[in-house]
């Protein structure tokens, strides 16, 4: 090809071809040693290139691994973030303390002053002992011992046990606004609990429930977190060998409580030596021993409305048999200061004693001018009432006091039971029997504190009647079998059988039903009575009069096996119907059978004079 016609590219290819041919020709005449050296140097160059590439690849892999590990750690690794313990315990003020009670973190209702820890009265009531009573009106703390009252005034180092004054080196009760705080050291004199105080932040750890608990030890240094998960903030660092209380299993985590009162979560794999332990504390509970008769109580209430009526005691008792206790209605609270009216009679008591009867005088709160809250929430008023009752009992030779406080409002319940506690001390010291009347237990009367009554009082009496009463919207039995049975069974959940007396009615109600008029239905709209189609009225009748009214009406009596009573009905004027569930020997025998089956302390009855003569033989059969 003519070189003048060749392109640059063609010329470059031709040059390379000639150079390669020249190298090949030269190689035929080259020294063999020189060729070897050249090849060796070429191999070294290739190895260096390969090693550099491998090193670069390794570095790349390491960098990628580190980056991936960092990303994985950020996403899945345990955080070292800590949670603010002041926030955790709810501490917002310098004097506040966090509170953990029985492995539960509570609101920070505790304070510290001068090295003394104080717990709020509300927490004392709920977690330590509800036997401590704070009078917010007169600023007095009270605790009831079997034969003494412990008293401590607010912001004082002094306290009294009955008439003996003692002192502590700390203020016993501190007040901040409406809140009372009680020194834990003082509480521990009378209540069974342990406590420890910790710092940073200040907190108190209390144990008031003793018994079996699950524990485990920490394998290696670890963390307790606010939630189950490695990303949850740390509440507390725990050391190898630390003992934790195990509260709950949560997947791969356990909910635990540390010694310092922190409740949180730790991985199961961090724990070992799980076992059950029993915790206890040496403490002698006060023994509120009272009076227990060595016979079954056979009591009847005697409604006495005037001093003159006391003279009828001989006639009233003439037909009775087997009776051993009588309760005359002698005392009534007359004002909010705790004063009482009394129609007690020494002659009455003397005659009852001659008949072999004890006298347990009744006190009621039926005066509409008396405000139960005002009366019972002031210590001075309660004490005045208690002293007047006991003094009247001693002056008249009375054997016991029967408390019949009815329709106590819910918010007065704590003050009412404190009254019973305080009265029990005076009765115990003066050898007086204390009995307390109660409704059949229902959800709406739990504030009567039957369980505490069962500790403080000698006898707890169930008023096993008024199932249907004067204001009821429908006719029904005064004391059906199931109603009485429920009353006994529910009371026995709270009170020992040897303190329980079941009261039966010597009366019934005669009901009159008439269809409501349009006007009456209109009046009842929006009220509880709206759902009832009949207007009902009733009158209370004693056993004899009730039987007489049925006889006069010519009605047929049939046994109602559901309520276990004889039943009768008849037509009256103006489309009205009369209904009556009779109380008689047949119905009372069933109720007395319940008393016997449950081995109760005895029976009571309302009221003397309403019974027929055959009833006493029946009762005698069950109480003897």
Where are these predicted regions, by residue range?
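Primary recognition of N-terminal secretory signal peptides and signal-anchoring hydrophobic helices
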Residues: 3-4, 8-9, 15-16, 29-250, ...
